[in-house]
Amino acid sequence: MAMGKGGVIKLRHHFLAAASFAALFAASSFISVPAALAGTLAEDAKAFGTREFVRGMDISPSGKRVVMLVSAAGSATTANVIDLDTAQVTRIAQTDGKPEKLYWCSFAGEEHLVCQYGGIEKIDGDPIGFSRLITVNADGSKMRPMGQSQSDRGRYVTQSDGDIIDWLPGQEGQVLMERVYVPEVGTTGHLINRTKEGLGVDQIDLDTLKGKNVESPKTNVSTYMSDGRGNIRVSGDWKVDPNSGQMTGLFTYRYRKPDSKTWIDLGEYNSVNRTGAYPLAIDGERNVLFARKRIGGRDALVQISLDGSMAEKVVATNDKVDIDGVVRFGGGQRVIGYTYADESRRVIYFDPEFDKLHASLTKAVPKKPSISFHESSRDGQQLLILASGDTAPGTFYKYSRATRTLKEVAPIRPELDGKILASVKPITVPAPDGVGIPAYLTLPPGSGGKIFRPSSCPTAALRRATNGASTGSRNSWRHEAMR
């Protein structure tokens, strides 16, 4: 797509030619694309019942490549690096889903990627979830684990080996990794023994896998937060009951001023009654911490100065629902907006440029779906955008801020291309006690948006918006292939 006069965006060609995308689609051994709008019931069941083809995507620092997680035969998932200029596809990783599954892959430089896989395995008869980080080159070579290697003498088995907390923009192939350390037992008679324990931070060179310690591991630390510029500015501890050894739900947080290694008390967060400030993200450019804080019975968004004053400012509140997160952008990960969910997932941009761009793109993309800024190139000029809605399963686009052009990269469900999909309508269902229960009604194509009685419209589907107060989770307005 290209930006025309008056801010109108016009359609342009795809990055992947139809033949190239069809080849990738077929090579995955996923499913043959059925004839649009003319399929049999069996074909429709196959198309709607299959897994999403595109399961995740990231864009390289140059903006010239993407890494795409795609569904393959059976329960397998493949990670492919795709050159957007030549449409060349390089497979870099694959899991069979028995039990390992690829969760995500992201660029840590033009030639280096980090992926996470995991699954569920039985240990002593109990199902235990696990996740592990690996690094791999963009050509598929040099795949290696990033966490501490497993030891037969390890005191325990870790479910997670760590996480990437800073992608260190500008430092090719370098990342800050929050790393889990496990000490060894039965050390008698061994010359070399592991004694470190807990959560620490290492700067990892992905070429050599050599690590430079940034924060020494500690057993009581639950999290570290970086400012996106390579500096650890916030850390949190969990409080454990000394008698039972159980976690209490209380967390204490500390922060550092710029260019300082001295920790300063930030406060306590109680996850049981949700009092205190819960850290979400550090904006290094503003030198502030964005956090959730209970105000008027709802989680609001506040910003706390990290200059030593701890000056607090309320950024946004919502008297109906909780604000649940922030939206970040660019190599330094500056905060540009916040998120919440009512009848649908919503993003509010307090950055004027992105607010205007979001409005323009929403009008330009077919069916006017919900637009989210997924990732960006290192210079922030190439944006990876996801457009999705109730009648649009989702399509990834690349937007150039310099030329104001928008090009399609790949649809999430290509087998549904051209099919008329059912719309989803937010409604309120009255309960016997008069309380209104939020819900979603999936209406069959051709209903004209009218709500029928189930006897006259047996294909309509109703689902609750909330999944129960105990979990705090909820459904949202979106496309659901199985509804």
What are these regions (language model features)?
Residues 372-483:
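Serine-hydrolase catalytic core recognition
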Residues 37-383, 389-392, 399:
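Beta-propeller folds
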Residues 34-38, 481-483:
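Short, intrinsically disordered, charge-balanced linker/junction segments flanking boundaries
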Residues 24-35:
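C-terminal segment of classical bacterial N-terminal signal peptides
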Residues 15, 19, 52, 273, ...:
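Solvent-exposed, flexible loop/coil residues
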Residues 1-9, 36:
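Short, Lys/Arg-enriched N-terminal segments with co-localized hydrophobic residues
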Residues 7-22:
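Bacterial N-terminal signal peptides that target proteins for export
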